[in-house]
Regions:
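N-terminal loops that bind phosphate or other acidic moieties
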Residues: 1-151
């Protein structure tokens, strides 16, 4: 709290509303067989965020945090809000770019929009997360580029 008070310049800082915002999307690289489960698991877990049936939800409840999943790119539509959906999954990165530059910008802007909305709703502390089968493979690829290391 001391750090947050310092950042905000408010020594009487009180955080009344907190949210965890998992951004849910499917990864086209799954078609390469890089995962233990199928892509359909992304939608199942995303809907479980809504019903509170995930470990992230259990931990969030313990600290009074609301879980607000966002469909930013799942391959199918679910009960999760798709208002900010960029695409129905990404392309297979082994065959070409997973996303266009415009899609990448749109995805970043979707995150910015969620922060804006939640701030307007009075949320004082936000955490983000992700859910998408194949995400370890895509994260490894990003880390490889950023760290200039082979996978």
């Amino acid at each position: 709290m001391i750090q947050i008070a310092g950042i905000t310049g408010n020594p009487d800082m009180k955080i009344q509303k907190r949210a965890l915002v998992p951004m849910c999307a499917d990864n086209g690289v799954v078609e390469e067989g890089v995962t233990q489960t199928g892509q359909e698991v992304t939608a199942i877990v995303a809907e479980n965020f809504l019903s509170g049936d995930t470990s992230a939800c259990v931990m969030s409840r313990q600290c009074g945090t609301k879980v607000i999943p966002v469909d930013i790119g799942m391959a199918v539509d679910t009960k999760v809000s798709k208002e900010l959906k960029v695409a129905y999954g990404t392309a297979n990165m082994t065959k070409g770019p997973a996303m266009t530059r415009a899609q990448a910008v749109q995805a970043l802007e979707a995150g910015i929009e969620m922060v804006r909305r939640l701030k307007e709703e009075g949320y004082g502390l936000l955490a983000t997360g992700e859910m998408g089968i194949g995400n370890t493979t895509t994260s490894s690829a990003v880390a490889s580029v950023l760290l200039d290391r082979s996978v």
